[in-house]
């Protein structure tokens, strides 16, 4: 008794735990194992009392998911539970009405209408089973039961109406569920969507059964009742047919139902009940769970596969590309193979678990039969022993009768023993099968673990391939961008030249055409035609003058950047000689010499840019004079090629030639590389290094003075920005001074190690090229320091641009980098002075970055302060400001693209000229 009470307690506790775990607030489908435990419990208990007792303690109105899972679980119990479940559920039918009314107007996350429909469905379903107790919960009726129902015409007529109502309730439920899925944009691969869709699996099974019975019963009614009396049946059935067909088609497209339930296909047209021949061609729609294998499978494990998680079954989609990458195709194939293997393993495990549970149930049943047989055998033994004792006490006269009774008892005992042995053999057989099934399950789990590991390895391989693909795409993008930039710059220059040539040719053709077409009329009206041609030529000359002026404006911009590139002086001298020869042509004095004017203007703008760059390359001291003269020549050229001045064309061209002769003289006087005296280069280096030190000290002092003036003239955010920028500039100059000191110490060490008993002057003379490199670097540092101070002063006073200061800081960092590289060339790699110089160079780079960051932050702060306060604007004014801001943004983007193209062209020209110089020096060295 104690053992039975303990087993009973364990059973009840398991039922309570299963109900509590099945009905939870988590938006995931109902767990099959918990539902299966409850269903098996109803069969073992032959009642659903424990379930309803447990559910009565749960406050289903607390959360919509609780009510939804409760309805799903009740639906499962009605189908797969004990045959008494529908009868017992009818006692709680009012509970469904209460829940339906409660959730009717509470559209919580979309569950409200769905729960209302589900509760109404269960209410009608329980009432249906109570009205027709012959119909089981799973709706499986054999032919004899169906014929019994069809025997009573009135009952069959009313039953078809009730079945139509059941179909309506099921279809209303699926409509509500799909409407909620569409409104929330859920799909069948997420847990929330699966939670909503899981009850529709039972709806598919129920609708297929009701549909089959309706077709057969309505055909039977038409054979016994006039068709006019069944018009309502036919009308309702046609509507239900269309809705059911749509339901099956939509459900078959969902990935969630694909591996769980077999969805039947209905014909294109509803059966014609007025023709009994359609009944012969009618085919019963079979809907069954895949875990059952057919519609006649065991009900206890009918929903094992219902929670198959397909959330990860969606294959990874590679980003669309016009040309598919083989590696991406390999990734997709590997992903699909992994998912297929995983699905096969999971399905195999589900089937194994289902069979194990069948074996366990059968084992429990056999155990009960075995215990019953054992008790009968014990009772038979006791009866035999009792009879033997009675036979010993009876009279001898009844010996034969007693012997017969003893033999009969012995035969019964022997039969009981044989039956017991058979039951024991069957029990051992099922036990061995159970052990074998457990062994197979363990092997399957090991295979699953191996497949999971293989999937993980393949995922890592896929990730690596993705990274390689992305890196290759980035490399291709960078290469394409670079190629497009270079090609764009070249194409733009070529396009401009071609456009200019085309315009000149078109203008020439226009002039020639005018001359030819009016040649015959020239005799009659020569004065008039001459004036027209003169006006046309003047217009052409005016247009060409505008083009030349634009080239001069471009040249003026190029003069501002003359210090950013290097240019060989001898090439500039050659271009200057060509320009002098061309401007000596007296045809330029004529206003209508359009072709010569255009060519001369183009050559003049190019030569002026080259002259300024060559002067900076040859000698920084000579740069100022040459640059000023270039600007003077440019101004004279603008006057000479325009019609605004009162002077004649010949006088303006004469003044231009004089300015160009002056510039040519300055270019001739530029020092060449061969003019540097190797004997005095050492002294020049020392002097330049001292001048560089003085320039840096003066720059530091001027920055301090600028800082003092800024404190006096500004306040607030402007003062904070100026303080930050000037402090970083001062720190930059300090580390540059340290780098210069380290460079001089390293140079002293190099000279001491390499003079070999000679004087430093002799060392500088022997290594004059290295000395010249140091000299050039020192000059660049001095000039860059002065430019930095001027840019900082302009930023503080508001007269300059923040970008100028950024460029100046980067320029001085580049100059110090040149000094660092020049000093490092002949240094010993193990020298401590070289290490100190490297540390100083890194400090310069860091402080340069800090200056750039401070300038950008200050610019952002000031822009935010000045431009982001729009509280004073009206609606119309704000819209106008918005449009103007967009226009300005587009203009700036266009200007940025043009400057990038210009920079690319300048760099290309610079590299080309540098290559020419290198080739010429190589030829001279060979000679």
Swiss-Prot record:
Q: What is its biological role?
A: Regulates pre-synaptic vesicle recycling at neuromuscular junctions of mechanosensory neurons. Plays a role in maintaining a normal defecation cycle.
- How is this protein named in the record? Huntington interacting protein related 1
* Organism per entry: Caenorhabditis elegans
Q: What are the record keywords, sorted?
A: Actin-binding, Coiled coil, Cytoplasm, Cytoskeleton, Endocytosis
- Please give the Gene3D superfamilies that the UniProt record associates with this protein: 1.20.5.1700, 1.25.40.90, I/LWEQ domain
- Please, one GO biological process term? ultradian rhythm
Q: What GO cellular component entries does it have?
A: clathrin-coated vesicle; cortical actin cytoskeleton; presynapse
What's the encoding gene here?
A: hipr-1
Residues covered by the I/LWEQ domain: 673-914
Q: Which GO terms describe its molecular function?
A: actin filament binding; clathrin adaptor activity; clathrin light chain binding; phosphatidylinositol-3,4-bisphosphate binding; phosphatidylinositol-3,5-bisphosphate binding
